[in-house]
Amino acid sequence: MPVSEAFAKLCVNEKPPAESAVAVKSLVFKPKTPKSATPVPIVVVALQSTTTPSALIANATSSKDPRLARDDLVKQAFQSESARAFILGDLANATSNFHLLIDHELGTVDGDTILQLNDSTYMKKSDMMKFLNNFEDSQKVVDFSQEVSKETATEGKKQQKKQQPSKAGTAAAAAAAALEDAKLIGITVDKALDFPGWYQQILTKGEMLDYYDVSGCYILRPPSYAIWENIQKWFDDKIKAIGVQNAYFPMFVSSRVLEKEKDHVEGFAPEVAWVTRAGSSELEEPIAIRPTSETVMYPYYAKWVQSYRDLPLKLNQWNSVVRWEFKHPQPFLRTREFLWQEGHTAHLTAKDAEEEVLQILDFYAGVYEELLAVPVVKGRKTEKEKFAGGDFTTTCEGYIPQTGRGIQGATSHHLGQNFSKMFNLSVENPLGSDHPKIFAYQNSWGLSTRVIGVMVMIHSDNKGLVIPPRVSQFQSVVIPVGITKKTSEEQRKHIHETARSVESRLKKVGIRAFGDYNDNYTPGWKFSQYELKGIPIRIELGPKDIEKNQVVVVRRNDSKKYVVSFDELEARIPEILEEMQGDLFKKAKELFDTHRVIVNEWSGFVPALNKKNVILAPWCGVMECEEDIKESSAKKDDGEEFEEDDKAPSMGAKSLCIPFDQPVLNEGQKCIKCERIAVNYCMFGRSY
């Protein structure tokens, strides 16, 4: 359904009583730009009672002097009749990029509250947020109450010009400015009230990523890329230990090769990006950018494998892939380009191949549980959900407590002989030439940067990121404290030298540590900054600590404090980091275990789903029944169906996996949805 039609469908048909509706304004601003540049309009959605200062709008969008837009810009950008007639539904008609600023105070309004968008348009708050999430790449939640008056800022600039402050005055002014800025630096959205807005802020303010000017593509900043590097190192060591080698294949695929395996390509066809031109010339044959590499690699496997002695062939590549066609990009979870590893192996026997599939799945579970402190359920995908062209797919499934949705973590596929027959990857039978040749048994398996998004969603809080110590770019920050105006230069130097010594000692035992020795910022500001960035522990060191030969250690996840003597630094700090790692996993596992429930009767299925649970239900194994479960669980009690986008989080419960760890299935147990006999318990849930 087009987004414009979706907006109309979400509107309330009958006008509610005036006293029950909350007024909301939608304003379009135009930033000041050079005459040669095209202005990017700024749309502000706020409570009618909220003041929206232009200075804060400029700050939130990194623009200059935004002013209310005139009719010509609004007509051009959103095809609206005029600026006065602009309504949120016009966002669906946008002809170019725009900024969307959402008032933080809207998060305090209950989801069922009716909002008045203009004289004749009304909508539930939850439905308005659902509509605005169509433009997630453009949106940002802003706390307009934090604005500093323009007059004060202007007067401050005048005073700076009039007098040259002393060195001490400069430091004090810098510290004061930093504390004032901290209001805007911190997270301004409650995780429980506006999860999408919180997720966006925590990634950008925590410096995990930045938005790129191509929709659905993101810049991985050093903290997030370091997490990916730590995962790479751990997983690379694991797969090399079982004989896998790294290689690299080109990112381009000819249409002829890509279309050779139709069943496989069909699942990716809408998402394939094509190169059709080189400069001003049309290419004779369009070239695809790989969505995955089976069809890229397997012709060469067939070329290189000349004898059964060449098997197994086990290659992995660390690369990026492009999958283009979807409407709801989400950083890390669903992006148009993403980093991953993809392993492709060929074996002489099905037994060897199937054993490797499960071994790799254990490695993937290790990435989540041992590195990221994220619990997962291992299982097998249904026939409907398995990898196109494969015999069977195994998976690690996670759970996002805030939304109650499952999320696919990583998959390991057994392809059988389907691809080897297609690409003629065959060898002579070891039993002799009088036996038929053998087509290789193949596997493919992949893990992507999605893991980072899952980790952030599960562990982080309203203070900022919470990053497990084993994958964090830095595991500890050393912060000198207790330095005041009365502290002599000699004392200050001694505190810093002692702090640097602590930092150095930690590095020597493999702790990823750094120190912040900038005296222009207060310790309190630094504490907030490193909590926002998710540094696992901070180590405080002041004059009194030095006298006692100790440091104070504070954990990021729960602010638990430890006093550690200098003599125990090398032994105790690693222990504290491991304790934190374990506590993060324990907390996440308790939540997942609590919200993974067994339901045997259909009458309890949707109520359990609506309590943010994933469900273990007896199932017959029939695909039509699986589809019926998803369709039926997507309906409201009044029979109205939720609108769904295939790539958006599903409202109906889809099959997540058939867990390897099965509850006891009683003899004669019926399927939860039909009258057939159940063959196993399947895990169902709303999902990403």
UniProtKB/Swiss-Prot annotation:
Gene3D superfamilies: Anticodon-binding domain, Bira Bifunctional Protein, Domain 2, C-terminal domain of ProRS, YbaK/aminoacyl-tRNA synthetase-associated domain
UniProt keyword Magnesium, yes or no: no
Record keywords: Aminoacyl-tRNA synthetase, ATP-binding, Ligase, Nucleotide-binding, Phosphoprotein, Protein biosynthesis
Stretches for region Disordered: 631-650
Phosphothreonine modified-residue sites: 170
Classification via InterPro entries: aa-tRNA-synt_IIb (IPR002314), aa-tRNA-synth_II (IPR006195), aa-tRNA-synth_II/BPL/LPL (IPR045864), Anticodon-bd (IPR004154), Anticodon-bd_dom_sf (IPR036621), Pro-tRNA-ligase_IIa (IPR002316), Pro-tRNA-ligase_IIa_arc-type (IPR004499), Pro-tRNA_ligase_II_C (IPR016061)
SMART domains for this protein: ProRS-C_1
Tree of life domain: Eukaryota
Protein's UniProt name: Putative proline--tRNA ligase YHR020W
CDD domains: ProRS_anticodon_zinc (cd00862), ProRS_core_arch_euk (cd00778)
Modified residues (Phosphoserine): 149, 655
Catalytic activity: tRNA(Pro) + L-proline + ATP = L-prolyl-tRNA(Pro) + AMP + diphosphate
Pfam families documented for this protein: HGTP_anticodon, ProRS-C_1, tRNA-synt_2b
The species this protein was found in: Saccharomyces cerevisiae (strain ATCC 204508 / S288c) (Baker's yeast)
SS bond partners: none
A molecular function GO annotation: aminoacyl-tRNA deacylase activity
Enzyme Commission code: 6.1.1.15
GO CC annotations, alphabetized: aminoacyl-tRNA synthetase multienzyme complex; cytoplasm
Example GO BP: prolyl-tRNA aminoacylation
Coiled coil start-end: none
Similarity comment: Belongs to the class-II aminoacyl-tRNA synthetase family.
